[in-house]
Amino acid sequence: MAVRFPKNLVQPEGSMRFGLDALLLACFAAREFGASPHFGLKNPCRDTPWLPPGPGFAAIDLGCGQGASTAGLLLRSENVRALGVDFSPALIDAARKNISLLNLSERAAFRVLDLSRAGASFPRPAFDLALSNPPYWERGEGRASRDSLNDTARRGEGALSLFIRAARTALVHHGLLYLIFPASRFTALAEALGSCRFGMRKALPVRPGAEDAAVRVLVEAEKDTVHDIRFLPDLVLQEADGSSTPQALSFCPFLDKSAGAGEREQ
């Protein structure tokens, strides 16, 4: 039986529904890491016991939620194994179920982890790349949610710095971090990355339509470097009639509801 990703993902009651951002992040990371000159990263700790055994690069999804970005990365990158971590046992349980439905369990593992304790969990850097879709707002900013899991995913005091520090702990020297963040907070993101000795390498603005301003930015940052940003051509998601643009479908095939780009035989 074919299981189509991202349709019918298991999502706990009261959690933030996964959305387009998670899919865009996965496709951006897969594309840019595959094209990176650091594709030959030397990582003697890559075979961490937290990852399923096997060949390939080691990825970590920080705040993985239901596993949408983890699954998307694995579907787009056949030579990557991934660990997803989240503070919520309910979300980790959902992520494991989703990965199992997609027959990706041999390449992915999930673990409950408080990112403030990442240093104790990763005594030595072990990952080549990291993904993060961190809370976009500080505590008190943005629209509050009545559901605690949903609200925690949206905002948190010092949350952005917490996620970036966790990435620094987990990544090897010159490892690559991929994030998605509101375009309106690009300066805050640059400052947070710089304070943790991550240098921005690429930035991809994302616009809903051709006449719209960017609402998101996808970023590649490198550990132990300084900012040297190359802005990529804007990604425009929708035509005037609301359909996905050819550019968007090429970038993220998971947006094509009529195609089987995310199908896996079960």
Regions found by a protein language model. Give the residues of each.
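Class I SAM-dependent transferase core
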Residues: 1-31
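Conserved SAM/SAH cofactor-binding pocket of Class I
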Residues: 21-34, 54-143
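SAM/dcSAM-binding transferase cores
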Residues: 213-266
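Short glycine/threonine-rich catalytic loop with a Thr-x-Gly-x-Asp
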Residues: 16-19, 65, 211-212
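Conserved beta-strand segments of alpha/beta enzyme cores
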Residues: 8, 81, 107-109, 199-202
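Intrinsically disordered, low-complexity terminal tails and inter-domain linkers enriched
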Residues: 32-56, 261-266
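Conserved Class I SAM-dependent methyltransferase catalytic core
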Residues: 157-214
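Mobile active-site "lid"/loop adjacent to the S-adenosyl-L-methionine
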Residues: 134-163
